[in-house]
Regions:
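A short beta-strand-loop-beta hairpin characteristic of the jelly-roll/cupin
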Residues: 50, 57-84, 94
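A beta-strand edge to alpha-helix "cap/lid" segment located at domain peripheries
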Residues: 73, 83, 87-88, 116, ...
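A short hydrophobic beta-strand segment most commonly corresponding to one strand
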Residues: 89, 103-124
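A short, N-terminal "cap"/entry segment at the start of jelly-roll beta-barrel domains
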Residues: 1-38, 124-143
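Conserved short histidine dyad/triad with adjacent acidic residue
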Residues: 28, 39-57
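Conserved metal-binding segment of the jelly-roll/cupin
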Residues: 45-48, 82-103, 113
């Protein structure tokens, strides 16, 4: 793995199927003058782990894939296979999920960029339904 795995992602465990780990790469306790810093965390997914469908409001999300193999899917579109070096730019308001392939660990760096005209600090995740085992297992043939 390219970056630290971090601690078990217990704070968000209810939004994941399987186990994930979170390693913040930028400090969280910034002063008001430093809030322009781009927040980044390394997220590690154990094999078969994925997050629920979700939507980012007030910000776009950028995923930089750094190790292993994963999946990214937008609602109503086919899943995209991810590998180290891939970058996914997710527009604000798009329903999506991402996670590891069934037989591979997967790491990505996640960051978000507030969209123009959003209220500072208004970015929020809307967590939705899990990706069903049936949906996920259909991807196994695409690996």
């Amino acid at each position: 793995m390219s970056f630290p795995i971090g601690k078990p992602n217990t704070a968000y465990a209810k939004y994941f199927t399987g186990n994930s780990h979170l390693a913040p790469l930028t400090p969280k306790n910034l002063s008001e003058n430093e809030k322009t810093m781009l927040p980044m965390s390394n997220v590690t997914f154990e094999p078969g782990c994925r997050n629920n469908w979700h939507i980012h409001h007030g910000a776009r999300q950028i995923l930089i894939c750094v190790a292993g193999k994963g999946w990214y899917q937008e609602w109503g579109k086919p899943a995209i296979e991810l590998k180290a070096g891939d970058i996914i730019d997710i527009p604000e308001g798009v329903k999506h999920w991402h996670g590891a392939q069934k037989d591979s660990w997967f790491q990505h760096i996640a960051t978000h960029v507030e969209v123009e005209n959003s209220q500072p600090g208004s970015e929020a995740n809307e967590w939705l339904e899990p990706v069903s085992d049936e949906e996920y297992n259909k991807l196994a043939g695409k690996e």
